[in-house]
Amino acid sequence: MFINWTMMLISFSIVFLYMFFMTFYFNIFFIFEYNLMSILSFEYKFYILLDWMSCMFSFTVLMISSMVLWYSHSYMSSDKNKTSFCWMVLMFILSMLLLVLMPNVFMLILGWDGLGLTSYCLVIFYQSSNSYNSGMMTIISNRVGDVMVIMMIIFAINFNSFELTSIKSFELIWGLLIIIAGLTKSAQIPFSAWLPAAMAAPTPVSALVHSSTLVTAGVYLLIRFDLLFNNNIFSAFLMKISLMTMIMSGMNAFFENDLKKIIAFSTLSQLSIMMLTLSLSLTNLSFFHLIVHAIFKSMLFLCAGFVIHNLMGNQDIRFLSDFFKFSPLILSCMMIGMFSLMGFPFIGGFYSKDVIMEFFFLKSNNMIEMNMFIVGIIFTFLYNFRLFYMLLLKGTLFNMMSKDSINIFMNYPIFNLTVYLLITSNLMSWLLLPEYTMIFLSFTQKLMLLFLVPFCTFMFMILLKFIKFFPYLKLNFLMTMWNLSELTSFIMLSNNKFLLKMSINDWTWLEMYGPLGIKSKIEHNYNFSMTKEINVITIAFSLTILMMIIVY
């Protein structure tokens, strides 16, 4: 079943790739329209938009999904519910395509809610209390974004149209609704706690849902509303949120020991870079980084799943060092992914990250924002250095195994994604990135970019010594996402207590004035009236007998 759907998704992805080249080269787009109903002067229409951006994103989603299903054929082979898992993944892909191809706010809610529902089902796929708690945190955080989209639909009625292309100006409330919806789906502060918690899902779900498709839906929504960032208020707000998220996720990734959570925090960091690029009004550059990041991050998750699967569930990086002696191909692919994450020359993220840094230093005049950006970039280097150090030099192997016990079948989709990363990053950089852009930087700023790598190495050695000499130091504030997890849990528990109290009040009111109350009142009045009637009959009968005695 997995292989059949893999081949079908690859076929559809090739169609979207052809559409991308055709729409991009000829600079055209296609809109398919179907009128569902019309009420008074308002028409409800079903749209499908095929332009170069939607076709490229759809191609990426389908290609990654096909590799994940191919990978799941081996990864989920012993699971009893693998058929249900396959159908849930396909429903998720359908919801993602609806979100990408719909230029209509009213139809956007179909894909948006479909993503939230299917991601919740996939997070709780492994039935345990941890999965249930993670799923509840995920769906509650995403419900905030759903409410924002519904309010967007209400406000769109003022424009007498639901089409995104017909909206040329944005009011303050409309813009805030769009930004908050994007922040919830892309897990930016203060909605960041759900993304690491969602790592309770199977690793193929993390590779597809929580690295390359679901979390990028918020960024894609903001890319579609790129006119929003002509307003300085929205740009400044999004820039500050993204900078804080970048620093927070980098700190947590450096102090984390769980392999999947480290990759999840790096996803959070890269999403904040995409948001930062959008705040600078660099739409094509943000979209390019979104595509490249989706490829290499899904590949990193599949590498992590390969390691975890063959080590019987162990995912602590302190016990994974010698494993890569048994699988040098996976180590090579993982190193390419991490080099791309750091912006190593001519690999993946290099083409976008270097340009993003230069544009940021060119356009930003705020010293605090520049320092925050540098700190975030430094932590990106640091947690990658630490991951290299623990996987290759420092750690020990938790479970020794023979080379024959390693499942080779999962190597093929990982290798395909690696080749796809190397080809796509070069090709997309030629097509999307600006050819002639004058970037004027001072001599100090140029040297700052060059000295980041040796400075990060020096900071890495200092922090390693710091952790070594203080092994029992409680870094709760840094390791719990600045207490966002506890804050989210507290709000959820407080809401539950409030709802419980309100439900008790509701039951009390229902008891008094609802159906039960009406029933009790009717019974009381009936019994009272029957008592009165019985008394009247008794008195009348007694008087009749008394009169008969007197007369006769």
Swiss-Prot record:
Membrane topology (UniProt): Multi-pass membrane protein
Main EC class the enzyme belongs to: translocase
GO molecular function: NADH dehydrogenase (ubiquinone) activity
GO CC, alphabetical: mitochondrial inner membrane
Superkingdom of origin organism: Eukaryota
Signal peptide region: none
TM region positions: 12-32, 48-68, 89-109, 147-167, 172-192, 203-223, 233-253, 262-282, 288-308, 330-350, 373-393, 413-433, 447-467, 532-552
Record Pfam families: Proton_antipo_M, Proton_antipo_N
Catalyzed reactions per annotation: a ubiquinone + NADH + 5 H(+)(in) = a ubiquinol + NAD(+) + 4 H(+)(out)
Name under which the protein is recorded: NADH-ubiquinone oxidoreductase chain 5
Protein's job: Core subunit of the mitochondrial membrane respiratory chain NADH dehydrogenase (Complex I) that is believed to belong to the minimal assembly required for catalysis. Complex I functions in the transfer of electrons from NADH to the respiratory chain. The immediate electron acceptor for the enzyme is believed to be ubiquinone.
Enzyme Commission no: 7.1.1.2
Any one GO BP annotation for this protein: ATP synthesis coupled electron transport
Keywords: Electron transport, Membrane, Mitochondrion, Mitochondrion inner membrane, NAD, Respiratory chain, Translocase, Transmembrane, Transmembrane helix, Transport, Ubiquinone
Family statement: Belongs to the complex I subunit 5 family.
